Amino acid sequence: MSGSHTDAGHVVVIGAGIAGLAAAHRLLDRHARVTVLEASDRVGGKLLPGEIAGVRVDFGAESILARRPEAIALAREVGLADRLQPPATATASLWTRGVLRPMPKGHVMGVPGTAAALSGVLSDEGLARIERDADLPRTEVGDDVAVGEYVAARLGREVVDRLVEPLLGGVYAGDAYRISMRSAVPQLFEVARTHTSLTEAVRGIQERAAAAQQTGPVFMGIEGGVGGLPHAVAEAVRARGAEILTRTPVTELRREPSGGWRIVTEGSGNLGIAGSAGSAGSTGNAEGNAGTGVLHADAVVVAVPAPAAARLLRAEAPEAAAELSAVEYASMALVTLAYRRADITLPDGSGFLVPPVDGRTIKASTFASQKWGWIADQNPDLLILRTSVGRYGETAILDHDDAHLVDVSRHDLREATGLTATPLETRVTRWDDGLPQYPVGHHARVARVREHLGKLPGLAVCGAAYDGVGIPACVASAAAAVDEIHGDPRTVQHLTAHPVRSLHGGAGE
């Protein structure tokens, strides 16, 4: 029995990103009375729907890893089954050494089963270095190792710099030579512990994937945008009696002497909104004035980014707070551009990734109108593109204004694709400290956080800072938090043993 066990009662969820909303959804399945508190003026966190040139798009995450069940199942449960759509094309390119090159097949997160799989992407020297893998002695990985460090030791730096780095960077906006292999690419970590040759291990992964005959798309989108998922979850939990209060930042979280939790909010004009059957105000467990409010709960799920979680936990769980304060984040920006289709011709495919070693400004570009049929169908006369700029350790570009980010994006798009037309409209979306970094030892840090919190009944954490940055990982993290406060540690134990992949690592799809 977990030390954080509590019976179903009133549970406050702090944070209305997809993890917090998924936690609320699961709590209602356990017959809890739920209040969700969100500091900003909207739900959804990093999932942000929007519009450019009259076309609905995503200004945050745009796809869901469909080979994991958690997020797709949640979408179906909240009525989005008929809006799930696979990409119209999954063919991508690499912009490297001055040319757009087809993304190689036959690799796992950029790690090839044979040198031939990367022909055309690597130099002759780089391809020859891969062949040495079979003759090298075993590379020990210990309790964890950086993805880049291990792959470079086995196959050479060129594999890391030209392929592993842009693939990992597309998800974490991080540095492959710092990112934990155990947490970020667990399938490679597992085989690295049991195999000497990395290429042989990758071929084994590919053979098992082929034998399993996995069918269906690797990724899935949602008509109208993935940003519609949190709104659908919010509507579903409200319909079941939960209350969601925006513009309600939590300033203090304290354990009650008699058990339960005291949650102090400020700026909470929404506190105790009339007409919500399960609202804190209508059930007598809220108090306060025009500027502050106090809620009392049997349990709390903290579903906010690590720095905010650290501030809330400092009074009651200082050790956990110290661990969370050390979590680093990457900042980046997305530049979305709308063009007249008649003005431009794009290469085939869904877009391209850019290895940092090539020294370009943009890190990737998505041809959104070619990737997603639902975007193209809204206005066949337009083409929507987006680029990403900035990553961990490379923030100087983000000091520039939006106009400059548009200019450098257009420059790199011209160099890569020949695109010279002037866009009809542009939008820049900045995600400051948007992506948590998973350095070597991340799994141990998360375990320590949960160990500290396990001593406090009715308290758990979830979100992108723990079990993976993808949407399925956030949903799985939420499920683990809910089960934990109800005395069931098995979901957390499963997540610890089997980390959720935040990106596809199959047979080179």
What are these regions (language model features)?
Residues 53-138:
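Dinucleotide-binding Rossmann-like beta1-alpha1 core, especially the glycine-rich loop
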Residues 2-5, 104-106, 111-112, 290, ...:
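Conserved flavin/dinucleotide-binding core of flavoenzymes
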Residues 19, 42, 307:
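Conserved Rossmann-like nucleotide-cofactor binding loop
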Residues 129-251, 296:
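Active-site/ligand-binding neighborhood in enzyme catalytic cores
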Residues 28-52:
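Glycine-rich FAD pyrophosphate-binding loop
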